[in-house]
Each structure stands twice: as structure tokens, then as C-alpha cells.
Design a protein with these regions (language model features):
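Extracellular/secretory-pathway, disulfide-rich ectodomains
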Residues: 2-158
């Protein structure tokens, strides 16, 4: 009988540890979460495809994340490359939602769960990283043009 109680107690301890580890997963600190809304003024530089664009804050020279369009109200989230001091054409080097455009007021959000989501104004998800609850604590655009989601130790999740 005592061994049965001991086994039950051990099971309860493991269940308690499992619940605690599930609850204590890393989450994105409030200072690192963001939501960018596709609205406002367009950028002034000449870009590939003669597109209009809205630059977002994630930036690491010479790369910048932007919403761009060549057709009214059909935007693509893309990474642009070009230097500020150059009059040369700035080029789009990566696109998140190619062939699946979003409209005005679409959002790019890094939530506290660590998932980076591009959603249309009506809530339709156009693109996402599928990194919810995987330990993401920050998003960065690196000087190499890589966009990374990192854990608390600086390791790249994606």
C-alpha cells in the first residue's frame, strides 16, 4: 500500500513540474511586441517596379521592411535594399505574402506569444511564422538582410 502511495505522489510531482514548465514558457516582453499598421504617407525614394511603399521601423542598413504596392490597395510585405545616400533604385529582395496581397490598414504584429503575423484589416491571416510559444523574445532585421526571431539567449528560432 505504501508503494502505491509513493508512486501516486511521484506522479503528482511530475504533473506539477510539467504544468509549471508549460506555464513558464518564455514570452515576448512588452517592450519588444509591436503592431505596424499599413496606413499613412508613402515613401519618397524611387523603388523597383515603380511601386508606392510605406517603410516600417525594423531597419538595418541597407535593409528595411516595407509594405509596397503596384496595384491600388494590394500590398506586399517586403524587405527593401538600398542606401539612403544613393540615388540608385532600391530593390525588393524578399516578400512575405507574394500572390496573397493585403489591403490598407493590414497589420504586422509580433505578439507576446512570439508569432509574427501579417493580417489583413478584416483579420484574415496572409502570412505568419508559426512560432507561437517557441521561446521567441525579439524580432530583428540584421545588416545581412536576414530577419530573425530570437530566444532569450540570442539564438535564432527562425
Amino acid at each position: 500500500m505504501a508503494s502505491h502511495q509513493l508512486i501516486s505522489a511521484i506522479h503528482l510531482i511530475f504533473l506539477y513540474i510539467h504544468i509549471l514548465s508549460t506555464i513558464s514558457q518564455a514570452s515576448v516582453p512588452p517592450s519588444e511586441t509591436f503592431t505596424y499598421v499599413n496606413s499613412g504617407e508613402f515613401g519618397i525614394y524611387i523603388v523597383e517596379y515603380d511601386a508606392t511603399y510605406r517603410a516600417l521601423s525594423p531597419y538595418s542598413s541597407p535593409f528595411q521592411l516595407c509594405f509596397y504596392n503596384t496595384t491600388p490597395d494590394a500590398y506586399t510585405l517586403a524587405l527593401r535594399m538600398g542606401t539612403m545616400r544613393s540615388e540608385s533604385l532600391r530593390r525588393w529582395v524578399w516578400e512575405a505574402n507574394r500572390g496573397n496581397p493585403v489591403n490598407e490598414n493590414a497589420t504586422l504584429t509580433l505578439g507576446k506569444d512570439g508569432n509574427l503575423v501579417l493580417a489583413d484589416a478584416d483579420g484574415r491571416i496572409a502570412w505568419q511564422t508559426n512560432t507561437a510559444n517557441k521561446g521567441v523574445v525579439r524580432f530583428q532585421v540584421l545588416p545581412t538582410g536576414n530577419m530573425v526571431l530570437q530566444d532569450a539567449k540570442g539564438n535564432e528560432i527562425i
